[in-house]
Regions:
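Phosphate-group recognition and catalysis centered on beta-loop-alpha active-site segments
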Residues: 1-205
Length: 205
């Protein structure tokens, strides 16, 4: 691989881990763990109510007792139960190790998932991300890191703090037959725009 692309969310104790969403119901075996049954709850993630278990309700130590599973039934299930949830630092270590084996640089392309959601929980992602990147010496445009986000304000904040490359992602509800974006709410705009009452959509970006 040229890059490893982890989606980042925050644990209860503020550690960045790689999960596609804050809700880990489908991507771990948490639903089978009786010791965590009481953690099942409903949270609003970017304007959508979701039921399940959420990373922000678990410490890193608790998350490490869980095992990852493949949520899509049509994909390979043979790795279910074999791996822990990796921290962002573990992903960076993996990239370095694999790069050394291959004799070339393997970059990391992290996405800050749901920044507004995390900020409301008191677990903002940005400074935590910057601290980890600085620990690894990744602070310049030449660093093998590209940070991406569907929101705008957090990227603007990051730009004031680091010179690493940043990418603005765009989303939509679907793609129309003519190739245009189906900008149906709540997938029509960055969530920080929605919270701020900003009328612009992803098409404006």
């Amino acid at each position: 691989a040229d890059f490893i692309e982890p989606d980042l969310v925050a644990t209860k104790d503020g550690v960045l881990v790689a999960r596609h969403e804050p809700n880990i119901t489908g991507t771990t075996d948490v639903a089978t763990r009786p010791e965590f049954a009481s953690r099942k709850t409903t949270k609003n993630v970017d304007g959508v109510n979701e039921e399940g278990w959420f990373v922000s309700d678990f410490t890193l130590a608790e998350l490490k007792t869980l095992r990852a599973v493949q949520p899509l039934s049509d994909r390979d299930q043979s790795y279910n139960g074999k791996f822990q949830i990796p921290t962002f630092e573990e992903v960076l270590d993996l990239a370095k190790a694999e790069g050394t084996k291959a004799g070339r640089t393997v970059g990391v392309y992290p996405e800050t998932k749901h920044p507004t959601y995390h900020a409301k929980l008191g677990l903002p992602l940005e400074d935590r991300l910057l601290a980890v990147l600085a620990k690894y010496g990744y602070t310049t445009k030449a660093s093998p890191v590209i940070v991406q986000s569907f929101e705008v304000s957090n990227l603007k904040y990051l730009r004031t703090k680091t010179q690493v490359r940043l990418v603005q992602l765009v989303d939509a509800n679907d793609v129309n037959a003519d190739g245009s974006m189906d900008l149906t709410a709540p997938y029509d705009k960055p969530y920080d725009f929605a919270v701020a009452g900003d009328s612009r959509t992803f098409a404006s970006l």
